[in-house]
């Protein structure tokens, strides 16, 4: 008799996705981040659910309800900090996952890649709205500044902003709708992640060499289940070290002050994982130009498959492209640092140069490097 996991309609889906899935025999630890993102998402949904049981989305009570969770709810403090720092872990895994895709040419799986970009944008929107919910100073002013960017859209801009606000400023209506969206979006992310996996399993995984691995595939279980469990343990260890020893390391002290529309904080800045995009936004003196650059800094990922000029898929055997990739990583770290600095000399010019470099590397230098490598190998 055939095993039930291969015949049962539901178990068959799980079996083909996580047990009998043929996987390349040589995928490295960079392939662990997909499963880690799944774990992060489940963790965020669970901790978020328990926080929502005690949170009140009213401007007069939001800040107090978060304080109440930390002080009076059983283990409320650990749930709150696991949720806040879980978001940071989520973005670390996301950046690693996208970086892996760029380095090893996984973006040639077009549907998988494009759904991944949509997932990234949805996750960024979710994180932004979540940051508004505690209704601290940085929550309020962050919401005001970022939503205000839409007013740069010609003709309909201001109407659009007031429609999103639900009034003439960030107020009760804004907080309530942000809570509603912040609650529903993770479930949409989960659904999109399933579609992401569906398209991935149509082609099978890429591998570090970029060479088709059909001739040498191994079952996902037990080889990669055990590898993913190791990754999960390291992820949870890192998260709990953050939560239990330095829970406020990545937060902003200003958010421990209740929101006050009459008092602007000296430096308005988002959470660390948005700083690179924030630096690109600030580096352009024109409002509409900055907004366009902000959107393009993420949407440029959609263009990456079109800019692939190399005859090889992966960067494993392409040293010049490797140099370009790591310069891009250094540039993104520079932008992240600049995003957290005040708008003054020399940070302004450093931010502008780093922003120009970011677009230049992706749009010009990487395709040129690939063409040079093709010519060196006489692969016209």
Curated annotation (Swiss-Prot):
One MF term in the entry's GO annotations: ubiquinol-cytochrome-c reductase activity
Where are its TM segments located? 33-53, 77-98, 113-133, 178-198, 226-246, 288-308, 320-340, 347-367
Q: How is the cofactor bound?
A: Binds 2 heme b groups non-covalently.
Q: Where does a ubiquinone bind?
A: 201
Which Pfam family is an annotated match for this chain, by its short name?
Cytochrom_B_C
Q: Which domain of life is it from?
A: Eukaryota
* Compartment(s): Mitochondrion inner membrane
Q: Which annotated residues bind heme b b562?
A: 83, 182
Gene3D superfamilies associated with the record: Cytochrome Bc1 Complex, Chain C
The cofactors it requires, by name, are: heme b
The record's function comment reads:
Component of the ubiquinol-cytochrome c reductase complex (complex III or cytochrome b-c1 complex) that is part of the mitochondrial respiratory chain. The b-c1 complex mediates electron transfer from ubiquinol to cytochrome c. Contributes to the generation of a proton gradient across the mitochondrial membrane that is then used for ATP synthesis.
**Oligomeric and partner information:** The cytochrome bc1 complex contains 11 subunits: 3 respiratory subunits (MT-CYB, CYC1 and UQCRFS1), 2 core proteins (UQCRC1 and UQCRC2) and 6 low-molecular weight proteins (UQCRH/QCR6, UQCRB/QCR7, UQCRQ/QCR8, UQCR10/QCR9, UQCR11/QCR10 and a cleavage product of UQCRFS1). This cytochrome bc1 complex then forms a dimer.
Q: What is this protein called?
A: Cytochrome b
Q: Which gene encodes it?
A: MT-CYB
């Amino acid at each position: 008799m055939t095993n039930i996991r291969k015949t049962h309609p539901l178990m068959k889906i799980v079996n083909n996705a996580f047990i009998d899935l043929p996987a390349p025999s040589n995928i490295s630890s960079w392939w662990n981040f997909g499963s880690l993102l799944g774990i992060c998402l489940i963790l965020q949904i669970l901790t978020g659910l328990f926080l929502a049981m005690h949170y009140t989305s009213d401007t007069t009570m939001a800040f107090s309800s978060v304080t109440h969770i930390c002080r009076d709810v059983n283990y409320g403090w650990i749930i709150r900090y696991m949720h806040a720092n879980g978001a940071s872990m989520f973005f670390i895994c996301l950046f690693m996952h996208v970086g892996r895709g760029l380095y090893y040419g996984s973006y040639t799986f077009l549907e998988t890649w494009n759904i991944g970009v949509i997932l990234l944008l949805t996750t960024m929107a979710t994180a932004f709205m979540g940051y508004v919910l505690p209704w601290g100073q940085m929550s309020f002013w962050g919401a005001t500044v970022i939503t205000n960017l839409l007013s740069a859209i010609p003709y309909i801009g201001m109407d659009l902003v007031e429609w999103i606000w639900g009034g003439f400023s960030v107020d009760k209506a804004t907080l309530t709708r942000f809570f509603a969206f912040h609650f529903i979006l993770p479930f949409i992310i989960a659904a999109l992640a399933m579609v992401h996996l569906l398209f991935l399993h149509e082609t099978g995984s890429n591998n570090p060499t970029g060479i088709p691995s059909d001739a040498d595939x191994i079952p996902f279980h037990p080889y990669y289940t055990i590898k993913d469990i190791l990754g999960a343990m390291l992820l949870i260890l890192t998260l709990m070290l953050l939560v239990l020893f330095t829970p406020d390391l990545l937060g902003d002290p200003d958010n421990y002050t209740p929101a006050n529309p009459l008092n602007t904080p000296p430096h308005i800045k988002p959470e660390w994982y948005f700083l690179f995009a924030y630096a690109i936004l600030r580096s352009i003196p024109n409002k509409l130009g900055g907004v366009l650059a902000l959107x393009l800094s993420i949407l440029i990922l959609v263009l990456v498959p079109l800019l692939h000029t190399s005859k090889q898929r992966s960067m494993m055997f392409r040293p010049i492209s490797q140099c370009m990739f790591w310069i891009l990583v250094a540039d993104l770290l520079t932008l992240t640092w600049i995003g957290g600095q005040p708008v003054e000399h020399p940070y302004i010019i450093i931010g502008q140069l780093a922003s120009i470099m970011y677009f230049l590397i992706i749009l010009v230098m990487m395709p040129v490097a690939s063409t040079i490598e093709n010519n060196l190998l006489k692969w016209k």
